[in-house]
Amino acid sequence: VALTATADRLTRKDIALQLRLCDPAVFIASFDRPNIRLVVRPGQKRFEQITDFLRRRPGQAGIIYCLARRTCEELAQRLNARGLRAAFYHADLPPEERSRVQDDFLYDRVPVICATVAFGMGINKSNVRFVIHYNMPQSIENYYQEIGRCGRDGLPAEALLFYSYGDVKAYREMFQKEEGCPPERAALKITKLERMYSFARSPVCRRKTVLAYFGETYDRRCGQCDICLNPPEYFDGTVIAQKALSALKRTQERVGANLLIDILRGSSRRDIMERGFHRIKTYGAGREYSFAEWSDWLSQLLHLGLLEIAYDEHHHLRITPEGYKVLFEGKPVMLAASLRSAEKPLARKKMPAERTAGELDRREALFQRLRELRRTIAVQEGVPPYVIFHDSTLQEMADRQPLSVADMLRISGVGERKWERYGMLFLLEIQQFVSGDSAENAGP
């Protein structure tokens, strides 16, 4: 018998392979923890949000997970300075100190622990009322495992997640420094990290998204996550979903998201022609929609559980059983209109005389950050910086400060090819700059 607490399809397959199991019987319990309310927020002013959260729950036991050991210590110190009793825990503490902190938490002498992710794995404390992620976890599996340490008594509990692109950058740097990690393993980690970041920014019900990730169908909205309590505008996206699923089916599910979008939009890129995808019936069936719209909708189909990523097969998209119900049985699909509502004309670019000194300073600071990002990418790829983006394009980014995919694609010099290759890196850099997230992510 092989047992595991949390495993997606790929992990289950790998377990069977490693243990040399031949056609094993697999029993999967539900991943649903209905007593845990899932809330996700951007990382701006997270310390103030956490102090407010704790003051509204005096005496309740909870864990605050941090990426860095230093952050654990500093966050606990700042909370204590605000009159909120907290301790910190990480691997650098002496064994006797770790044991003391664990006992203080178990016996309710300290209600809040600021810790790295190892804390809680061997602790049987049923009345943990909340888990806060000060930094975003590196995958949805990790997220699910860590929030599962609250509400074990079945009573209401809350999981509060803060996210930022600074977390993504920190994990990427950490993965790159790992010694002996095969390239394919590193690529898988990065893909799962990006999936986690996509989850944090998704307009789809949190519970539905998490359960879909593990292959479990949840045909309703939970009614208590941050998305359900403040829902976006929805529209009937059944035909859009059917076009995407049909096109994927006709490629024999041998493409990733970007290539699928280009097929739907009737692109004449070389690999489409060479592989004969221009001959399939759904080639160009979605040419009336932009690349950005299709990118947003495919992400939603993924979080709705209609698509999945075959991590072990070149990260190609696959249609799930629920996806086939949409394709062949006409099961309706409601999509969030988040991108459509964001597609408003960008603010008129001010002439230099109209800008304040502060605005000019900020735009220049952003321009220099974008130039530094461009230089880093150019060095990695061994190409001149202008091949990435011209200075004029970076200047327009700094002036207009686009915050959505749709806005970014309206910047002169950001075509679909450039977007596909470099766009998200620059968009996330701009988002981080505008939110003032750098300082927030550096410490508590």
Indicate residue ranges for each PLM-predicted region:
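Helicase motor core with emphasis on the C-terminal RecA-like subdomain
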Residues: 1-184, 188-191, 215-220, 226-227
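Accessory DNA-binding and partner-docking regions appended to nucleic-acid-acting proteins
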Residues: 188-190, 208, 217-444
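Alpha-helical scaffold segments in soluble metabolic enzymes
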Residues: 14, 49-52, 195, 209, ...
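Short, charged low-complexity linear segments at domain edges
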Residues: 184-214
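Short polybasic/polar patches that bind polyanions
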Residues: 17, 80, 145, 201, ...
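Short alpha-helical segment immediately N-terminal to, or the first helix within
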Residues: 133, 199, 396-397
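Short, solvent-exposed alpha-helical surface patches in well-structured domains
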Residues: 14, 49, 74, 100, ...
